[in-house]
């Protein structure tokens, strides 16, 4: 009998020792309205961001406690490669979505600005007479491309107009065989009226 009494009397004592003195009974468990699990497990769900929004809106005090308690864990999980690390990436996907879209718009706008800068080249045509061997000369025409004039078309036009050889020798340069500096300006302005007097210069005789 003594043994039974001791066992029975010892059982409540053991239960009291194992109980949390600060706990209040019965305990109330808060279940998330999104995933239907206890709030402590929201961070392990596929969409923890929605769970946090619901918790912050309906139970801000509980949300604050959970945020403070899990902040260090979230930092360590973000660098992990396991399932928890994947959860950390899931939590970070929603906020940066708008930022990534904004960056794409900025990049597209930046490329547009570069194209505009390419069109700031001054529109200028220069004519020059260059000496060749045996007192011969060639006429050099530069700058037609700044007026969006096709150089191949201009080269054929000059060759036909002056009945001589003409060739495109550089990115924006045409060489005409012969000295036509007295007539070339009038010919150019007649063919391409957009090249006015202020946009064309006669450099005279120059060395190549």
Swiss-Prot record:
Claim: Cell inner membrane is one of the keywords in the record: no
Sequence positions bearing Phosphoserine: 9
Span list, region Disordered: 1-20, 69-120
Coiled-coil region list: none
InterPro entries according to UniProt: DENR/SUI1_TIF, DENR_C, DENR_eukaryotes, DENR_N, SUI1, SUI1_dom_sf
Compositionally biased spans, kind Basic residues: 105-120
Record GO terms (molecular function): translation initiation factor activity
GO annotation (BP), single: translation reinitiation
The entry's keywords: Initiation factor, Phosphoprotein, Protein biosynthesis
Compositionally biased residues, Polar residues: 1-12
Gly residues bias locations: 77-89
SUI1 domain: residues covered: 125-192
CDD domains: DENR_C (cd11607)
Known role: May be involved in the translation of target mRNAs by scanning and recognition of the initiation codon. Involved in translation initiation; promotes recruitment of aminoacetyled initiator tRNA to P site of 40S ribosomes. Can promote release of deacylated tRNA and mRNA from recycled 40S subunits following ABCE1-mediated dissociation of post-termination ribosomal complexes into subunits.
PANTHER family: DENSITY-REGULATED PROTEIN, DENSITY-REGULATED PROTEIN HOMOLOG
Family the UniProt entry places it in: Belongs to the DENR family.
Protein name per UniProt: Density-regulated protein
């Amino acid at each position: 009998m003594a043994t039974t009494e001791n066992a029975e009397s010892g059982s409540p004592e053991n239960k009291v020792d194992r109980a949390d003195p600060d706990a209040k009974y019965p305990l109330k468990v808060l279940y998330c309205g999104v995933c239907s699990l206890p709030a402590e497990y929201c961070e392990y769900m596929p969409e923890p961001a929605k769970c946090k929004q619901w918790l912050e809106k309906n139970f801000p005090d509980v949300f604050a406690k959970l945020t403070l308690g899990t902040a260090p864990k979230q930092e360590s999980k973000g660098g992990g490669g396991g399932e928890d690390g994947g959860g950390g990436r899931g939590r970070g996907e929603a906020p940066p979505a708008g930022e990534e879209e904004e960056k794409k718009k900025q990049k597209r706008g930046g490329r547009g600005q570069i194209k505009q800068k390419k069109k700031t080249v001054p529109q200028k045509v220069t004519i020059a007479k260059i000496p060749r061997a045996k007192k011969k000369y060639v006429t050099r025409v530069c700058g037609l491309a700044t007026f969006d004039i096709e150089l191949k078309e201009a080269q054929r036009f000059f060759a036909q107009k002056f009945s001589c050889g003409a060739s495109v020798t550089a990115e924006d340069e045409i060489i005409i065989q012969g000295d036509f500096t007295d007539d070339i300006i009038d010919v150019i302005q007649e063919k391409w009226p957009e090249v006015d007097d202020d946009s064309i210069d006669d450099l005279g005789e120059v060395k190549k």
